[in-house]
Amino acid sequence: MMIIGIDPGLEFTGWGVVSSTNSQSVCLLDSGVISTRGISRESEKLYKIYVSLLSVLSLYKIDEASIEKVFINSNPRSSMSLCYARAASTISVMSRGIDIYEYSSTAIKKCITGSGMAPKEQVSFMVRSSLGIKQDVEINNHSSDAIAAALCHVYNTRNRNFALK
């Protein structure tokens, strides 16, 4: 099964594609960040996220997608921007007929590190450790969070399948 994880953001949207087999192994196929820095109009940023994700989706036979849920923080403007980026990401995935699953950042962190309050550095460390990614391979926080979302979905899917047997 091939899963794309998405960490939405208006300036930086992270993505990571993992492959999971029945033998319980998971490997990272690719990851990256869609940057909209230098684009001033919000509508153009959203379009770039949408088109860029479509491009990534066309490279792989994605079975399912996992995306981080939006949380509302104390800054309404940044929360709205995050919602827009998430919508652009969701529409890209849904337009390809791919089922999308949503997880809160707390649920993803708990699944990956054991603590829903884990700092980004701990999430990144556990993502690298789980997938055997060497320290000299550069993966920024946005990609790491997206890969964590994909891993969270893999682990949750396995637990559901195990419970059904």
Curated annotation (Swiss-Prot):
The active site is at D7, E68, H142. Keywords: Cytoplasm, DNA damage, DNA recombination, DNA repair, DNA-binding, Endonuclease, Hydrolase, Magnesium, Metal-binding, Nuclease. Binds 2 Mg(2+) ion per subunit. It is found in: Cytoplasm. GO terms for cellular component: cytoplasm; Holliday junction resolvase complex. Pfam families: RuvC (PF02075). SUPFAM superfamilies: Ribonuclease H-like. NCBIfam families: ruvC. This is Crossover junction endodeoxyribonuclease RuvC. The lineage of its organism: Bacteria, Pseudomonadati, Pseudomonadota, Alphaproteobacteria, Rickettsiales. The gene is ruvC.
